Amino acid sequence: MLVLSRKNNESIMLGKDIEIKILGIEDGKVKLGIEAPKDVEIYRKEIYLEIQEENKAASEQKQDWSQLKGLFTKK
């Protein structure tokens, strides 16, 4: 893990397209601003983990495909 120290209004770059800037430090919390291309998905870690869990649960559900049988018969 790379560990960096940054002061208020300082930034770090991830590659050439993603900038993470320290917007403020208050009451032990750091406020970050992230500039990235629109196709880059950005999530808080706890939200990302919830999405992963939901996707896994959805993929493990058994599906009843019998209702679709009639849609794919040749006429």
From Swiss-Prot:
Q: Where in the cell is it found?
A: Cytoplasm
A GO MF term: mRNA 5'-UTR binding
Q: Which GO terms describe its cellular component?
A: cytosol
Which biological processes are named by the entry's GO terms?
bacterial-type flagellum organization; mRNA catabolic process; negative regulation of translational initiation; regulation of bacterial-type flagellum assembly; regulation of carbohydrate metabolic process
UniProt keyword Lipid metabolism present: no
Q: Which InterPro entries match?
A: CsrA (IPR003751), CsrA_sf (IPR036107)
In the UniProt record, does the keyword Cytoplasm occur?
yes
What the entry lists under PANTHER family is as follows: CARBON STORAGE REGULATOR
**Family classification:** Belongs to the CsrA/RsmA family.
Provide the assembly information: Homodimer; the beta-strands of each monomer intercalate to form a hydrophobic core, while the alpha-helices form wings that extend away from the core.
What does the record give as the function of this protein?
A: A translational regulator that binds mRNA to regulate translation initiation and/or mRNA stability. Usually binds in the 5'-UTR at or near the Shine-Dalgarno sequence preventing ribosome-binding, thus repressing translation. Its main target seems to be the major flagellin gene, while its function is anatagonized by FliW.
Q: Which NCBIfam families match?
A: csrA (TIGR00202), PRK01712.1 (NF002469)
The name this protein carries in UniProt is Translational regulator CsrA
